[in-house]
């Protein structure tokens, strides 16, 4: 009789792992403590809730996360099914209606006869049986302590932040204009143009605004990909102009000119009734967010549906603990997945859950676990988190820097080079799947 598998945590990674197990005929006990016990960042009990942005970033094969998405589609990923079904306009990126997205994932998993849902907290590592731990960076204290004891080393951490969401009907449409950078895809973003004087006033107010106190927070402990806007602004007067307020490729169609700075708003739900402020992750006090962000042209009367906030994320010393199959080195049958392993980002977390779920299924079926080719985005992430120097281990997004370069003549054009790497990765994945996984 095939062994049942326990999956702890129904976030992006846990949901994907449960799906990969169930589609291979494996019985799954899926545990999720929400909504009985909430985290500092979640707002519902739905599976795969997106707590920060609603963007899954680029859909292009010239971008590593675009390659990762396409690989996951090839592997019949539930998270990619949900994202494609619940997407909202975002130019060349993939963004979703976060409520529809989490509901899609929840409905899919609860409808599967192989998956039994348990809405309860697990406070200890199961002592036996095949298990996937995917409790995320906001793992409850009791279980986090047990994981740390298992690691035999202190878990690492960084601070993550979310951007505010504003009501669409409170945006001044006479000031903002619709456009995607370089006109990629459809005109999907609302753009708030700033003159130099407006930018200088805003940047000065931002740097001097009062932040919320968070125990243990230091600016050095933020993840670069989710850096609070006020921390970024403090690095220099023009730092924001090369980051989230970069105006390049965003000419104002009203006068044909490129503004000095541009704040972008991205649609947050299918009804287009809410927009998030792109790149404005923050831990300013709520009153300060209202005061400072209403200085942005077009947002003078903005109504905040959700203010930005920050929370602490914990991750493991994976190079010392895990194999590239996401299985624990010192305990066969125990797998970890998601941001807690040191992959960073929604898609990356789901991708790790996909690999862990496939390998947990193989373990349950009495087959050998597999490691994905390092020439793929899935394989390169697993390789990075398990082979990098543990002393300098930091969370990592999907990146072409993690994937071996092309052999032969060097391609100078970066976009073309990246597309060729993606082409090779998808071919290698197809061959790997046919040889190792299509039993």
From Swiss-Prot:
The keyword tRNA processing applies. Catalyzes the folate-dependent formation of 5-methyl-uridine at position 54 (M-5-U54) in all tRNAs. FAD binds at residues 9-14. GO terms for biological process: tRNA methylation; tRNA wobble uridine modification. Transmembrane segments: none annotated. This is Methylenetetrahydrofolate--tRNA-(uracil-5-)-methyltransferase TrmFO. GO terms for molecular function: flavin adenine dinucleotide binding; tRNA (uracil(54)-C5)-methyltransferase activity, 5,10-methylenetetrahydrofolate-dependent. It is found in: Cytoplasm. Belongs to the MnmG family. TrmFO subfamily. It is an enzyme of class 2 (transferase). Its EC number is 2.1.1.74. Keywords: Cytoplasm, FAD, Flavoprotein, Methyltransferase, NAD, NADP, Transferase, tRNA processing. Its cofactor is FAD. It catalyses: uridine(54) in tRNA + (6R)-5,10-methylene-5,6,7,8-tetrahydrofolate + NADH + H(+) = 5-methyluridine(54) in tRNA + (6S)-5,6,7,8-tetrahydrofolate + NAD(+); uridine(54) in tRNA + (6R)-5,10-methylene-5,6,7,8-tetrahydrofolate + NADPH + H(+) = 5-methyluridine(54) in tRNA + (6S)-5,6,7,8-tetrahydrofolate + NADP(+). It comes from Lactobacillus delbrueckii subsp. bulgaricus (strain ATCC BAA-365 / Lb-18). PANTHER family: GLUCOSE INHIBITED DIVISION PROTEIN A, METHYLENETETRAHYDROFOLATE--TRNA-(URACIL-5-)-METHYLTRANSFERASE TRMFO. NCBIfam families: gid_trmFO, PRK05335.1. Disulfide bonds: none annotated. GO terms for cellular component: cytosol.
């Amino acid at each position: 009789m095939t062994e049942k598998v326990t999956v702890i945590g129904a976030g992006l990674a846990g949901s994907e792992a449960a799906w990969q197990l169930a589609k291979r005929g494996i019985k799954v006990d899926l545990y999720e403590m929400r909504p009985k016990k909430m985290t500092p960042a979640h707002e519902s009990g739905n599976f795969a809730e997106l707590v920060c942005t609603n963007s899954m970033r680029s859909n292009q094969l010239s971008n590593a996360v675009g390659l990762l998405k396409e690989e996951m589609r090839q592997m019949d990923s539930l998270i990619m099914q949900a994202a494609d079904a619940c997407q909202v306009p975002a130019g060349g990126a993939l963004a979703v209606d976060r409520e529809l997205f989490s509901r899609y994932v929840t409905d899919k998993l609860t409808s599967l006869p192989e998956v039994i849902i348990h809405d309860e907290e697990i406070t200890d590592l199961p002592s036996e049986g095949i298990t996937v731990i995917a409790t995320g960076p906001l793992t409850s204290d009791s279980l986090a302590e047990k994981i740390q004891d298992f690691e035999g080393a202190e878990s690492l951490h960084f601070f993550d932040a979310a951007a505010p969401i504003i009501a669409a009907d409170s945006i001044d449409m006479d000031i903002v204009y619709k456009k995607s950078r370089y006109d990629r895809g459809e005109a999907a973003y609302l753009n708030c143009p700033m003159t130099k004087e407006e930018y200088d006033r805003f940047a000065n107010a931002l740097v001097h605004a009062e932040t919320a106190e968070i125990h243990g927070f230091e600016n050095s402990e933020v993840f670069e990909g989710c850096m609070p806007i006020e921390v970024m602004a403090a690095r220099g007067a023009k730092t924001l102009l090369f980051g989230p307020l970069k105006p390049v490729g965003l000419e104002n169609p009203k006068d044909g000119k490129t503004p000095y700075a541009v704040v972008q708003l991205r649609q947050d739900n299918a009804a287009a009734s809410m927009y998030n402020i792109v790149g404005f992750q923050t831990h300013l006090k709520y009153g300060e967010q209202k005061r400072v962000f209403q200085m942005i042209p077009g947002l003078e009367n903005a109504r905040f549906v959700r203010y930005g906030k920050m929370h602490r994320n914990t991750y493991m010393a994976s190079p010392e603990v895990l194999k590239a199959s996401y299985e624990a080195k010192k305990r066969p049958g125990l797998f970890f997945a998601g941001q807690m392993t040191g992959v960073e980002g929604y898609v990356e977390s789901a991708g790790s859950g996909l690999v862990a779920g496939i390998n947990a299924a193989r373990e349950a079926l009495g087959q050998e676990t597999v490691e994905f080719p390092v020439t793929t985005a899935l394989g390169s992430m697993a390789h990075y988190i398990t082979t990098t120097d543990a002393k300098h281990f930091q969370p990592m997004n999907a990146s072409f820097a993690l994937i071996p370069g092309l052999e032969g003549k060097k391609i100078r054009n970066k976009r073309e080079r990246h597309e060729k790497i993606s082409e090779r990765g998808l071919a290698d994945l197809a061959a790997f799947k046919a040889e190792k996984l299509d039993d």
